[in-house]
Structures are given as C-alpha cells and as structure tokens.
Curated annotation (Swiss-Prot):
Protein family per UniProt: Belongs to the TRIM/RBCC family.
RING-type ZnF: 16-57
Subunit architecture: May form oligomers. Interacts with isoform p52shc of SHC1.
Consequence of changing residue 16 to A: Abolished E3 ubiquitin-protein ligase activity and ability to ubiquitinate NLRP3
Listed name of the protein: E3 ubiquitin-protein ligase TRIM31
Record localization: Cytoplasm; Mitochondrion
Low complexity: bias regions: 336-360
Lineage summary: Eukaryota, Metazoa, Chordata, Craniata, Vertebrata
Keyword Metal-binding in annotation: yes
Amino acid sequence: MASGQFVNKLQEEVICPICLDILQKPVTIDCGHNFCLKCITQIGETSCGFFKCPLCKTSVRKNAIRFNSLLRNLVEKIQALQASEVQSKRKEATCPRHQEMFHYFCEDDGKFLCFVCRESKDHKSHNVSLIEEAAQNYQGQIQEQIQVLQQKEKETVQVKAQGVHRVDVFTDQVEHEKQRILTEFELLHQVLEEEKNFLLSRIYWLGHEGTEAGKHYVASTEPQLNDLKKLVDSLKTKQNMPPRQLLEDIKVVLCRSEEFQFLNPTPVPLELEKKLSEAKSRHDSITGSLKKFKDQLQADRKKDENRFFKSMNKNDMKSWGLLQKNNHKMNKTSEPGSSSAGGRTTSGPPNHHSSAPSHSLFRASSAGKVTFPVCLLASYDEISGQGASSQDTKTFDVALSEELHAALSEWLTAIRAWFCEVPSS
C-alpha cells in the first residue's frame, strides 16, 4: 500500500502538461519545463524561430529543445515500479497452490479459493460463494453492526450524561453541606466569642469599679486616721507637760477625744456585690451548659467517625490522611490570631474602660441580645497587658471564674481547630 502511494507520487512528477500522460521521450525547453517530444513539436510547428511555453508563456527558441536523459531514466524506473506493483497485486490474487485466480470465498475456513480449490475434497462440502457475493453479504452485516453500534453510542452518550449529572448533583450537595457547616460553626464561633467578650468585659468592669470603690474607701478613712493620730499625739504631749500646763485647756482636749467617732463607709457598694453574684451565677450556668454540650458533641462525633471510617479501604484512608494534612497546613495561617505578613498578630478592640458609662453595660435590645459599648469589648489578655495597675489585675483575677474562662477558651480553640479540618473551596 505504501509503495503504491510512493509510485503514484512519482508518477505525478513525470506527467506531460499537454497530453496529461506519462512523458514519452521527455525533452526540456529554455524555460526549464518538460514535455513529450511529440507534444512540444506540434506546438512549435506553426511558429518560425520562437514559440511560447504552454505553461509560463515565455518565448523560447524552437531549435533549443533538448532531450532530458535523467527524466527519461526516471520515467523508465517508474514504469518498472508500476509493473512490479501490478505483478505483486496479481500474485496476491493468485492461488499459490494452483496458480489460478481467486474467485471464491470459503465461509467455513475464511479463505479465498480458485476453481481447483473449490472442487477439492477440502472445501467441497463447505459453504462457498463468489468473492463479490460474500463481500456483499458482509457489507450488509457490517452495516447492521454499524447501526447497532451507533444506537449503543447514542444510549451510552445518554447514560454518560445522566452519570455526569449525578456527579454534578453530588458535588453540589457536598459544596452546599460544606458551606452549611462553615456558616453554622462560624455563627457558633461568633456567638461564643461575643459571649466571652461580654463576660470578660463585665467582670473586668466589676473589678475596675471595685478598685475605684476601694480608692474611695481609702480616701475616706485616711483623713480620719490622721485626725485620730493627731489626737493621740496631743494627749501624749499633754501627759508629759508640767501640771500647770497640763491643766490648761485639758477639758477641751478631752472633750474632743471623747467626741471622736470613726465614720466607716461601705467598702464595696451593695449594687456591685449584687452584680458580681449575678455574674457568678451566669458563669456557673454557662459552664454547665457548655460541658453537657461538649460531652454530647464528642460522643456523637465518635459514633459518626466510626460509621464514616468503617467502610473505608486502605486507599480511602490514605487519601483521607493526605487531605487532612494538606487542609491543616492550608488553614493554619488563617486561624484567628495567626501571624500576618508583617509579623504582628491580630488583636481585639482597644481598651477604653476609663470612659465607660457606669450602667450602659447591661442594656438589652429589642431582639433580646445583650448590647454593650465598644469600649468594654476587651479580652482578659488585653486587659492584663494594656496599662492596668497591679491592683486592677489582682482584683480582676480574683473576680473572674477560672472555670468559665477555661470552658470558653476551650470551645473557641476547638472550633478553630475544627475549621482547619474542613476542606476549603
């Protein structure tokens, strides 16, 4: 097949552009084009000394026609190749055993047969038909198979489209559930963060107000102690005086000493005591609720994990482990409080507790949510690190429920860690 195509390509190069047949006695004229000697001679018969090339229309000399031996040899080689090709094809269509042309096809053996083979005992009882008839029969079978396969192709395309649709529906559901989980846990994280900020801000406010009350208490009692000390000093001085001087104004001094009374103000206002008691009660309630919720969530998660991993094979577990590892690395830098590009960490709102109104902390909105001024949105870490005195911090540490603080912090940490395990979009 390949050699036949090669011969045909070569034959195209030795075609006379006048007679459109293989060059016979090829000659070349001045412009370089090749023609049959007979064809180009007929063109030049009507002219005197010059004639125009049939291809490029260039004027060439009539007596400049010259034989092209190389082209003649090429034509001979091509003709020899063509003869060999024809002989090869003829040989292929000839029975190698009897040297006769093939005319029949044996259905039983799938072989071509000549007249002699057809009558031989090897094929006489077989289903034998003419080559053209057998080919026509198989053409029909081929056409039937084409139609069957085309119908299967059509059905396969439909099945594939349905499968792709199911995959799309599945991935859409997965994405929806992922966004649902992220949204719900983000809301939970926000609620816990707001609750934590409020509780810490309230307890710090109580500590701050208690410290201010202590300062007021000291400011009220210190002058009285100074007055008492002066009275004692004056009596001691009188006691060491001579009799005459001792008796001078003695009644006034004694009367003043007897009339002295220590005015003891309330160290901590009852309103602050009440608010602290309410805060502690709220802290106990939250701690208990969080513990119950945490225990239930952990128990349910354990059951869910067991169901999820039970049907996984080794490859599934491997892909799961890689996914967890990659997601953890990807999301670690996006956790709240992680380092930014400049090496600084994200902090909460600044602490401006000195300008906080005394009772605006406990206003309630129409939606039932507790509202509080931005100046009180300070975390414990911010309070202890932004200019609070040692007395302020000590009072705050005593008032704050360590159990509540630990519970809230544990939940916020757990939620952030959970975010790192959820694949991102």
